Amino acid sequence: MAHMTPTPVMDAAQDRTMILNMGPQHPSTHGVLRLLLEIDGETVVRVMPDIGYLHTGIEKTCEAKFYQQVVPLTDRIDYLCPMTNNLCYALAVERLLGLEIPPRAQWLRVMLNELTRINSHLVWLGTHALDIGAMTVFLYCFREREDILRLFEMVSGQRMMTSYFRVGGIALEPPLGFFERVKHFADRFPARIDEYENLLTSNPIWTMRTKGVATITAEDAIALGASGPTLRGSGVDWDLRRDMPYSSYDKFQFKVPVAKEGDVFARYICRVQELRESIGIVQQALAGMPEGPIKADAPKVVLPDREKMKTQMEALIYHFKIVTEGFAVPAGEVYQAVESPRGEMGYYVVSDGTAKPYRVHMRSACLANLQLLPKMCEGRLIADVVAAIGSIDIVLGEIDR
């Protein structure tokens, strides 16, 4: 009989404390996270996260798929930023293949990746504010998120699971009118950010619930593997887009927001400022978008255009072979990391020279950031645990995989 890991058990260390189950159905845990809390009255003594409720076996599934068939699976790792996962996986396989991606495809990837970051941060801000009691911000954020989802649907046909970035470039040229709609959104979005800040940043209830709450030092954040706004909220100036640039990010000008306090409010400020920087990158991409192809010149790897398939026998043959047999990737291994909305998302891909990956492992930013939660919550109130969970912005699909 297969060995089964027992459910984590926490025993009260003292007679005056008790054990409280929080989740996995609790709305503030943002998915199916279970927390075991040892509490003394309203004060939290210890926290033990219990994960695994959303395990889907995606990493193992990848081993049975052709390389191009893995792309739709990556959408479902972190379902709030599917294009970021598409990009990370595509970059890893492209490095193994030695593909050179056309500039237009790279700039489109950057623009859509930043729209994905904004989309994810809007979900975070709306739900985080709702957890603490600010319902209006939740409604405002989802108003703008709807605009972004419509842009995704326009360019890819899907609102969430887009599968738009492919190995070798992107799936399709954006349709007519797409860039105009992106520009319309980019022009008015900064004023929307001002609305969010007017409701929250100086709100005395918001500051009381976030300032000095769930503090984590830079040393602890680094030691526990934190990344993204959670790390930068503790004063560590590190962003992969700037410090290890990929996909033409070195061609764009942007600041990396950093706060030193390490509390819930600091992480909030970092993400709100990131909204401003991301929309600035989108505007730069619109202004400087290069012309040219959107796919690498690699007919044995990249699906041909549909128009060519109507007139060229070679294109039809290549399409048939890629779909039915996949494409072989030279033997080797590579680790590719990108800056997701939650931190360092990484893909470790091992090839044995066949058309299917030998191993695909996803490095989860959320799993590392979750390790900070017990230290954040020690000595705080139960209500502060809710604020702490929201401040690290976890997605359980990415953690459990």
Where are these regions (language model features)?
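Metal/cofactor-centered catalytic core regions of large enzymes
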Residues: 1-401
